[in-house]
């Protein structure tokens, strides 16, 4: 997911300028080829819009939005799993903590009136190790999840901006 988001975020700053120039020069096929060669979610979205040139503007806009939704869905593919790990790992660690403490109290009860510290150490060790384990897994997953969500939101903003720019290109008069 990280690699897909990273690849999707790369866009040539001149991409839309080149698309505008090709469309205004009537080089529709060249514009489509540029989109295919660029191979990013934004390029695929614009390619679908170019393929709809000549149809009503609402059809063009709908086609672009459909591709954008599909592309965002692909990018979000692994995020629910990562969110589950981020939320679940600390809870599993906490469960281990509770089980370790239960073990400690059971050992204390079994020992009767004399409590040896080494007897308590085993259960407390389990409690602390599982807590640490859950946090070691959960914290990076939490930060990773939020980082990827922020990257996707930035990409969605770029997709919206490029969609608007493309619709503006289609609304410009053709220069001869």
Regions found by a protein language model. Give the residues of each.
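Generic detection of intrinsically disordered/low-complexity segments and helix-coil linkers/edges
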Residues: 99, 119, 136-139
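Glycine-rich helix-loop "coupling/hinge" segments at transmembrane-helix boundaries
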Residues: 107-126
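Hydrophobic alpha-helical elements at and bordering transmembrane segments
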Residues: 64, 75, 120-124, 128
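Hydrophobic alpha-helical membrane-embedded segments
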Residues: 1-7
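Hydrophobic alpha-helical transmembrane segments of polytopic membrane proteins
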Residues: 124-143
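Predominantly long cytosolic amphipathic alpha-helical stalk/bundle segments
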Residues: 9-95, 99-111, 143-176
């Amino acid at each position: 997911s990280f690699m897909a988001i990273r690849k999707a975020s790369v866009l040539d700053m001149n991409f839309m300028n080149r698309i505008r120039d090709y469309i205004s020069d009537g080089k529709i096929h060249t514009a489509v080829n540029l989109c295919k060669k660029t191979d990013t979610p934004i390029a695929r979205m614009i390619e679908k819009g170019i393929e709809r040139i000549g149809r009503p503007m609402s059809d063009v806009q709908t086609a672009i939005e459909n591709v954008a939704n599909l592309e965002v869905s692909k990018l979000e593919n692994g995020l629910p799993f990562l969110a589950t790990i981020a939320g679940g790992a600390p809870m599993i660690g906490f469960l281990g903590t509770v089980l370790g403490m239960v073990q400690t109290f059971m050992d204390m009860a079994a020992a009767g009136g004399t409590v040896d510290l080494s007897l308590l150490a085993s259960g407390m060790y389990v409690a602390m190790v599982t807590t640490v384990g859950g946090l070691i897994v959960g914290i990076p997953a939490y930060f990773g999840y939020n980082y990827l969500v922020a990257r996707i939101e930035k990409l969605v903003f770029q997709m919206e901006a490029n969609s608007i720019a493309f619709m503006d290109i289609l609304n410009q008069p053709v220069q001869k």
